[in-house]
UniProtKB/Swiss-Prot annotation:
Taxonomic placement: Eukaryota, Metazoa, Ecdysozoa, Arthropoda, Hexapoda
Loss of function: phenotype: Death during development, the few adult escapers exhibit clockwise rotation of the abdomen and defects in embryonic muscle development.
Keywords: Developmental protein, Endoplasmic reticulum, Glycoprotein, Glycosyltransferase, Membrane, Repeat, Transferase, Transmembrane, Transmembrane helix
Glycan-linked positions: N161, N242
Membrane-spanning residues: 256-276, 310-330, 349-369, 398-418, 727-747, 791-811, 835-855
InterPro entries: GlyclTrfase_39-like (IPR027005), Glyco_trans_39/83 (IPR003342), MIR_dom_sf (IPR036300), MIR_motif (IPR016093), PMT_4TMC (IPR032421)
Species of provenance: Drosophila melanogaster
Protein's name according to its UniProt entry: Protein O-mannosyltransferase 1
Any one of the GO BP annotations: muscle organ development
Annotated spans, Disordered: 1-37, 88-161
Family, as annotated: Belongs to the glycosyltransferase 39 family.
Length: 886
């Protein structure tokens, strides 16, 4: 037997030399993919420990395929290979007898004689495993002869082909994904230009897109990316932006490219189904469960309706879904690899784009940060990672998922400001400096006006931050007593008025001077100097005293002093404090200087209170004097319109104020960062709410779809577009949330008791679904309970998509539990469960088709048809012919 063993070894040495010329140097990284079962050599020998030690320390024997095998690895999948005997157990060895190793075996080769293995043993075994007929028909000796003849493995052929054709791309088509896309495309694009009328928020978004086409500045509470993309598309379709969007339901003009206006939202809605499918695959769900998720997206009526019109939700949902899918792939990629770089960049770009379409998209970015932190926390348990590698993981994620979304956001707003450089109807909401930077904006009222404020200046004082209004007074006085029985000074009212008016003009006066005419050497007002402000029309000076304000009794009343010849003397002195003098200097300048006017007698600051006066104050906004020392934004003012007094005659001054002309001139310039900060503050803190809207709803009404939204009604029939979801799908998805939460609590308690009901692999999938889908739902739903503005059902759609994803996982997990625990006769429960799923899916399809007229608005519906679809009393469908609400 020893001679036979030696002859076999000699022949294998020759084979190894041939393979050495064909293959590359083996590297240890090829061992990383080995399974745990093949990482341990379990010797079946019953010899002594000394024999085992001697064998393990001896030079590695040669495998049946001619390459040197590692001691801790079986060389191949051939059961007749003698090196596999300890792993395979008792096998039939008809071809090559297995020699029994001795305590001191004969060395089979020296390091110089043995050729290093160019690839891992597993890669060679896998290259042969796809050919079972060859492994069955050929013996181990024939396999050696075939290898010695120069036959390359499949992996080697793949490498050779890649080297010879470096610019080739292997294309793989997923039929599930393409089928879902085609189904969604057909439903979204069917009669896309119908109805040819303004539908719901197309009124607002259409206006903004038209202003983009004409470069006119507008103000919107949401970021501009979605509107920019649609504007770019319709500009290619020949739209010039001259259509006037006046009211919901108004017909579009024949020249209006309705199809191209609605194309991008519809395309994003079509891509959402395959995006959901791929996201579920990345979450380790089966293809059938993933396909179910994509199909449910196609069959939901609310997602269909929202993606057929000029609305932003479909773009938001697509960017969110693709971003999270790329993030999951990114976390499984090797640090620094090409896949790691591209998937991380794609995830960051998509999540940044989601937040730049609507602010709610930043909730998805928050979910991404949560997933990244969870993954980093898990990496801390990996003993194979050094501290340097852990820091690289953390820093690279921070740079990618902070830097790239921030760059996307800033880039979109840079384009926004560069495009919208002309003044428009929304200018007044911005500060004077911002308006002055627009073509034909505030520059129209600053032509030729002096810069420095002096004794004798005629000015309008604008509330700089927050609500747009100007310091205003009129002849009316405060009531003697307020409804709460408090008394007032009965002085002339001072308010903050939201419109341009002649009563907004004030005169700046030195307390020691009477002549208001500005001479050749103007008396410039500087920081810290004392002035009086005299109302231009009534000629009464701005005053404050220790009398409680009308609507804000904790602050002082501000008035224009009327001398009633009583003991209450006027307190008319105000100190000018320039707050931005570090950049603008100590001289009080028009437009750019931000000032606080402090009442000298009481040290109270002139402040906009934010409250509205009743009818006796003409519903204008209250102005008070606040003794709070801290600088508040509502106490900051700036001079907007400014000119010097040229005459002492009061009537002539009044005539000049009434007939002042606004002539356009060149615009001033402010930095991009100044514009961005101002616009962001307005967008975040000055959003207009629609009180008591008949179709508004509360967050607790969304999971069970208690209220919908009427988007459009045909003027001739009861055909309408009404936002409703697939009620069976919505209710089932809500139950899925409860089922997952219950299972999570159950598993957590059982695992605490060291009872492991499911496999570790399934538990990891369960946790991943919770981290991604359950947390995604919570993070997109709970914040709305803290929002103080009018909300609608479509605000729930991002959370609904995550709820849909979680439902797909729950469906698959329940199937797993039934297959695991219902064995034997219980297998009928698995079949029954799957039959119920099919029936449920048929029900979802049936409800989708029944309510589809509300998504398209193309079919005229009778009164009875509309009534038959009112399944809940809270659904307020709109009816024609004197039936406004049912």
């Amino acid at each position: 037997m020893s001679a036979t063993y030696t002859n076999t070894i000699t022949q294998r040495r020759k084979t190894a030399k041939v393979r050495q010329q064909q293959q590359h140097q083996w590297t240890g990284s090829d061992l990383s993919g080995e399974s745990n079962e093949r990482l341990h050599f379990r010797s079946r020998s019953t010899n002594s420990m000394q024999q085992h030690t001697a064998i393990s320390n001896s030079p590695s024997p040669l495998c049946c395929n001619g390459a040197r095998a590692l001691t801790m690895l079986n060389c191949c999948v051939d059961v007749n290979c003698h090196l596999n005997a300890p792993l395979r157990g008792s096998v039939n060895r008809h071809t090559t007898p297995t020699p029994t190793p001795t305590a001191t075996p004969t060395p089979v080769a020296t390091p110089k004689q043995a050729s290093p293995s160019p690839t891992s043993d597993r890669s060679r075994s896998l290259s042969r495993s796809p050919s079972p007929s060859r492994s069955r028909s050929l013996s181990c000796q024939k396999q050696i002869d075939k290898n010695s003849a120069g036959a390359a493995s499949a992996e080697e052929r793949k490498t050779a082909n890649a080297s010879s054709q470096p610019f080739t791309v292997n294309l793989r088509i997923d039929l599930f994904s393409w089928t879902l896309f085609l189904l969604a495309f057909g439903t979204r694009f069917y009669k896309l230009a119908t109805p040819p009328h303004i539908v719901f928020d197309e009124l607002h978004y259409g206006k903004y897109i038209s202003m983009y086409m004409r470069n006119i500045f507008f103000f919107d509470q949401h970021p501009p990316l979605g509107k920019q993309l649609i504007a770019g598309l319709v500009s290619l379709a020949g739209y010039d932006g001259n259509y006037t969007f006046t009211r919901i339901g108004e017909p579009y003009s024949p020249e209006m490219p309705i199809f191209w206006f609605r194309f991008l939202p519809a395309m994003c809605g079509s891509l959402l189904a395959p995006a959901v499918y791929n996201l579920l695959l990345e979450a380790k769900l089966s293809r059938w469960s993933s396909a179910l998720g994509g199909l449910l997206v196609v069959l939901d009526n609310s997602l269909l309706t929202q993606s057929r019109f000029v609305l932003m939700e479909s773009m938001l949902l697509l960017a969110t879904t693709v971003g999270i899918a790329c993030l999951l792939r990114f976390q499984r990629s090797r640090l620094g690899s090409l896949e790691w770089f591209f998937t991380g960049t794609a995830a960051a770009v998509c999540l940044g784009a989601a937040g730049t379409v609507k602010y709610v998209g930043f909730l998805a970015l928050g979910l991404a940060f949560y997933l990244l932190c969870r993954h980093l926390w898990q990496l801390l348990y990996d003993a194979g990672l050094t501290d340097r590698q852990l820091w690289m993981h953390a820093i690279s994620r921070l740079l990618i998922f902070v830097g790239i979304p921030l760059a996307v956001y800033l880039g979109v707003f840079y384009i926004h400001f560069k495009t919208l450089h002309r003044a428009g109807p929304h200018d007044s909401i911005m500060t004077s400096a911002f308006q002055a930077s627009l073509d034909g904006g505030l520059a129209s009222i600053t032509k030729g006006q002096p810069l420095a404020v002096v004794h004798g200046s005629q000015i309008t004082l604008r509330h700089t931050h927050g609500r747009t209004c100007w310091l205003h007074s009129h002849a009316a006085v405060y009531p003697v007593r307020y409804p709460d029985k408090r008394g007032s000074s009965h002085q002339q009212q001072v308010t903050c008025y939201s419109f341009k008016d002649v009563n907004n003009w004030w005169l700046v006066k030195r307390p020691t001077k009477e002549n208001l005419v500005v001479g050749d050497e103007p008396d410039i007002i500087r920081h810290g100097e004392i002035i009086q402000l005299v109302h231009g029309i009534t000629s009464r000076a701005l005053n404050s005293h220790d009398v409680a304000a009308a609507m804000t009794p904790q602050c002082q009343e501000v008035s224009c002093y009327i001398d009633y010849e009583i003991k209450m003397a006027g307190e008319l002195l105000w100190r000018v404090e320039i707050l931005n003098r570090d950049s603008e200097g100590d001289i009080w300048h028009a437009i750019k200087s931000e000032v606080r006017l402090v009442h000298v007698s009481t040290e109270a600051s002139l402040k906009f209170s934010g409250r509205q006066l009743p009818e006796w104050g003409f519903n204008q906004h209250e102005v008070v004097a606040d003794r709070e020392k801290a600088i508040h934004e509502d106490a900051i003012w700036n001079v907007e319109e400014h000119r010097y007094t040229q005459t002492e005659d009061h009537r002539e001054r009044e005539r000049q104020m009434l007939t002042a002309e606004m002539i356009p001139t060149k615009r001033t310039r402010i930095s991009f960062w100044a514009k961005l900060l101002e616009l962001q503050s307005k967008m975040l803190f000055q959003t207009k709410s629609v009180p008591n809207h008949m179709y508004s709803s509360m967050p607790h009404e969304w999971p069970l779809m208690d209220k919908g939204i009427a988007y459009w009604l045909d003027s001739q029939s009861s055909a309408q577009i009404y936002l409703l979801g697939n009620i069976l799908l919505w209710y089932t998805a809500t139950m899925g949330i409860l089922v997952y939460a219950g299972l999570l609590a159950f598993y957590a308690m059982r695992r605490q008791r060291l009872c492991f009901d499911i496999s570790e692999q399934e538990w990891q999938r369960f946790v991943l679904a919770g981290d991604t889908f359950f947390m995604g739902y919570v993070m997109h739903y709970i914040p709305y309970f803290c929002v103080d503005r009018t909300l609608f059902l479509h605000n729930y759609l991002p959370a609904f998509v995550f709820k849909l994803l979680l439902l797909c996982f729950v469906v698959e997990h329940l199937d797993y539990l039934l297959r695991r625990f219902c064995t034997g006769r219980g297998v009928h429960l698995v079949r029954l469960y799957r039959l119920m799923l099919i029936l449920w899916l048929v029900g979802v399809l049936s409800i989708f088709s029944k309510f589809i007229p509300f998504s398209y608005g193309a079919r005229k519906m009778t009164l009875n048809e509309v009534r038959s679809l009112r399944w809940k009393d809270t659904w307020d469908f709109v009816l024609h012919k004197n039936h406004h609400l049912y």
